[in-house]
């Protein structure tokens, strides 16, 4: 995302809350959360790679008309919005 933001900045294209381009990320590192808090991003959510294969299986089952009988959570994932994120969120959840 840093590269994308640098390209937008270089092209003088505004990004973030109320601007030309909506920016979303899925890593929740401290830098990204600080950018979110500053309004330069719109949303950032945690995305745990350990859940990817499980989620892929669920998608395939649903596409085949199957139902999911139980819910498995490997880790709770958080999502943060630029209008509600706090410094406490950055400190507690930024990696």
Model region roles, listed by residue range:
Residues 22, 42-43, 78:
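Conserved beta-strand segments of alpha/beta enzyme cores
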Residues 47-95:
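Hinge/cleft segment of the Venus flytrap/periplasmic-binding protein
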Residues 1-34:
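Hydrophobic alpha-helical
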Residues 7-14, 35, 39, 58-66:
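Structured segments of extracytoplasmic/periplasmic soluble domains
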Residues 38-49:
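Short beta-strand elements at the ligand-binding edges of bilobed clamshell
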Residues 15, 43, 68-70:
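Residue-level detector of short coil/turn "hinge" positions at structural boundaries
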């Amino acid at each position: 995302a840093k590269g994308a933001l640098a390209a937008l900045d270089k092209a003088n294209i505004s990004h973030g809350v109320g601007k030309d381009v909506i920016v979303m990320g899925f890593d929740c590192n401290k830098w990204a959360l600080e950018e979110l808090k500053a309004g330069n991003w719109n949303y950032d959510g945690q995305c745990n790679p350990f859940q990817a294969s499980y989620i892929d299986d669920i998608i395939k089952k649903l596409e085949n008309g199957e139902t999911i009988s139980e819910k498995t959570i490997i880790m709770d994932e958080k999502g943060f919005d630029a209008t509600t994120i706090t410094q406490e969120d950055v400190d507690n959840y930024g990696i």
